[in-house]
Amino acid sequence: MIEPVVGYRMLQAIGWPWPGPPADAAWQAMCAVYSQCRPARVIEQHRSGYVVAEAPEVPIKVESLPAWQRRGFPRHERAVVGDWVLLDGRRIVALLPRRTVIKRLAAGEHYRQQLIAANLDTAFIVCGLDGDFNPRRIERYCVLIGSGGVEPVVVLTKVDLCADVGAAVAVLREHSSQALAVVAVDAREAEPVAALYPWLLPGRTVALLGSSGAGKSTLTNTLLGEQRMKVGEVRQRDSRGRHTTTHRALLPLPSGACLIDTPGMRELKFTGEEDLVEEFADIELLATQCRFRDCAHQAEPGCAVRAAIGCGTLDPQRLHHYFKLRGEIVGAADRSTLRRY
């Protein structure tokens, strides 16, 4: 890999994780193979191709690898917003290994993974304190995000529509066994949004995830300090919004961090590669104390999970949701296996 034309400081401004050449062994090996190429980051993805950057506010339209356009090429092996690539002129010639990635199962009957964003440090789960507030859905987001190696942070918006914000925060904490960060803000105002700055330090990359109408575009505009993203109205009957964000885009923030805004997601299907170790650490720990290793936590003797329910230290509904999510993950894994044969 050749020295970036703009220098590493400019690359750092769009999320390059080192002050100089890559310190990761896998990156070093690939950069050695493509020694005459230069690094860039994918900041937009369209059907017609990609837009990358080597510095803030300097977009470059580039050609993708020819293999990515071939029918049947795995979609999850193509570049996505947040990825780092190597360029030869205006052509992508290689995709650098991902440090983290958030993905889901695409809608439809066929098994197909859909990547949301790559090389993230944190994901803000944006949820309005109106009809959009759904602790179980947030729990599902946390599983998807945590399984990709990304830190989840819940950002509650529309605080003016909630009579008891503290109660909503308490409900979320009850539904999570991990030390889940929950921040309630008025997404329209800069002062309360400043509570998010600990996750928006220079060099960090954060994605906004959530339903349409949750306030992602409003929050983006406040963080940018300008009205760049279109904001849509929300239907009162179901608190649903229209898709004002139609594609994923990486935006450098004044704080020095990078923000990836994403369209609203209605479905959160698992790929089969997730685990519940982080989000359901309490149940996973109890399971290690059961008499039998293959305990199904139903009516087996010596079941520590059932004992916890009996003494009131574990909510039966939490166990029910654990079984539900685990069943979905196993089912998706089975579909993935069948697809290979």
Curated annotation (Swiss-Prot):
| GO terms for MF | GTP binding; GTPase activity; metal ion binding; rRNA binding
Which organism was this protein described from? Xylella fastidiosa (strain 9a5c)
Which residue ranges does UniProt annotate as crossing the membrane?
none
Tell me the residue numbers annotated for binding GTP: T157, K158, V159, D160, G210, S211, S212, G213, A214, G215, K216, S217, T218
The record's free-text note on cofactor binding: Binds 1 zinc ion per subunit.
Which keywords does this Swiss-Prot/TrEMBL entry list? Cytoplasm, GTP-binding, Hydrolase, Metal-binding, Nucleotide-binding, Ribosome biogenesis, RNA-binding, rRNA-binding, Zinc
Report the superkingdom from the record. Answer: Bacteria
Q: Where is the signal peptide?
A: none
Which cofactors are required for activity?
Answer: Zn(2+)
How is the subunit organization of this protein annotated in UniProt? Monomer. Associates with 30S ribosomal subunit, binds 16S rRNA.
List of residues binding Zn(2+): C290, C295, H297, C303
Query: Main site of residence?
Result: cytoplasm
Q: Where is this protein localized, as stated in its record?
A: Cytoplasm
Protein name per UniProt:
Small ribosomal subunit biogenesis GTPase RsgA
A single GO cellular-component term on record? cytoplasm
CP-type G domain ranges (all copies): 112-268
Recorded hits in InterPro entries, A to Z, give: G_CP_dom, P-loop_NTPase, Ribosome_biogen_GTPase_RsgA, RsgA_GTPase_dom
EC numbers on record: 3.6.1.-
Question: Which family does the similarity line name?
Answer: Belongs to the TRAFAC class YlqF/YawG GTPase family. RsgA subfamily.
> Its function?
One of several proteins that assist in the late maturation steps of the functional core of the 30S ribosomal subunit. Helps release RbfA from mature subunits. May play a role in the assembly of ribosomal proteins into the subunit. Circularly permuted GTPase that catalyzes slow GTP hydrolysis, GTPase activity is stimulated by the 30S ribosomal subunit.
- Enumerate the Gene Ontology biological process terms: ribosomal small subunit biogenesis
